[in-house]
Amino acid sequence: MTEQKRKLEKLTGVKGMNDILPQDAGLWEFFEATVKSLLRAYGYQNIRTPIVEHTQLFTRGIGEVTDIVEKEMYSFVDALNGENLTLRPENTAAVVRAAIEHNMLYDGPKRLWYLGPMFRHERPQRGRYRQFHQVGVEALGFAGPDADAEIIMMCQRLWDDLGLTGIKLEINSLGLAEERAAHRVELIKYLEQHVDKLDDDAQRRLYTNPLRVLDTKNPALQEIVRNAPQLIDFLGDVSRAHFDGLQRLLKANNLPFTINPRLVRGLDYYNLTVFEWVTDKLGAQGTVAAGGRYDPLIEQLGGKPTAACGWAMGVERILELLKEEHLVPEQEGVDVYVVHQGDAAREQAFIVAERLRDTGLDVILHCSADGAGASFKSQMKRADASGAAFAVILGEDEVANGTVSVKPLRGTGAEGEKNVQQSVPVESLTEFLINAMVATAEDGDD
């Protein structure tokens, strides 16, 4: 292939890392606005961390024998200074790092939230991408089951706000470290009795992370998993009281749940409460939100021992659900499209457009695609395609008379007429348009 031909090749994005195009951006903005409103209602503050962190943050925080660290991280050596860096595969460890580094907990607990892209090197499929987006909350400095219950109830309120149904809550307790250690011994003994039936993945995890074997999706292993020792049977009094307290709070708030003793999560920092929100509408990728308590993590990353809990949810999966349930909001067009022809009209059109924007209206000013003036007919086609409610038209006659012509594109005019073009003095234009929009809205309500 010649150098010249190589330069002419069409470049494409990285597989599994998707563009968010204008026709989809409205749905993202709707979701983001809904989430931000919810989080404000619960008193959470936004935190934004870099997408690149030191690799050690994740090996220490997530765990070296987890799938994420072993197989899924985008890691590289910085050519400038030799540092080992990683594109963040999740954000809890980064938020905790920031809280420790900036001494954020010196004056008490913090409620934090984030929204942004994460990266995992895995096979792209529906609901699972190499670059994906998560929104999450971290409640730092809260030890009781009330914090667990509140962050779970936040999710339910979000589903209600979005209009989503059929998302079910599963909960479990991973207990404390000594309880997991006792369960680990018995679990390994049990799995060793069936080692010849375990698949390669389960055999690999048998001595490094046996708890994850319980989370296998392999149909051939389900009977073995069903009969395995359950961690919930190893809970001591403190863990049991915490788990019972959570259940009481959920029941008191009429939030249904299922106890799933096989729910273990894929990150090493969890203890006590873990939970997932699952649906059967997304195929194999049924988890849309997950979280729990991670009391050891802050100390593990160099801070003082501090209780904490949180959750993260995959934005792309929730947007898939919104599409699946036909809950995609209709994208609104701009208020006004300004059409003009002639040099004097073009200059006046700029002035009119800016004045309308000063009043809070959304305005598109026609700009020629080729540097030449377009006909009124072609401009009106663009005005209609833009989704604008009204076209404001300026030609030589309008400039000479100090007027504009206004044509409704989506409903009635100020006097109730449908699609009737009217001449309006420039100084009265804003008032006219506002009245016309009110009339259009009322017509739509009828």
UniProtKB/Swiss-Prot annotation:
It is found in: Cytoplasm. One of its GO terms (biological process) is histidyl-tRNA aminoacylation. SUPFAM superfamilies: Class II aaRS ABD-related, Class II aaRS and biotin synthetases. The keyword Aminoacyl-tRNA synthetase applies. One of its GO terms (molecular function) is histidine-tRNA ligase activity. Its main location: cytoplasm. Homodimer. PANTHER family: HISTIDINE--TRNA LIGASE, MITOCHONDRIAL-RELATED (PTHR43707:SF1), HISTIDYL-TRNA SYNTHETASE (PTHR43707). HAMAP family: His_tRNA_synth. This is Histidine--tRNA ligase.
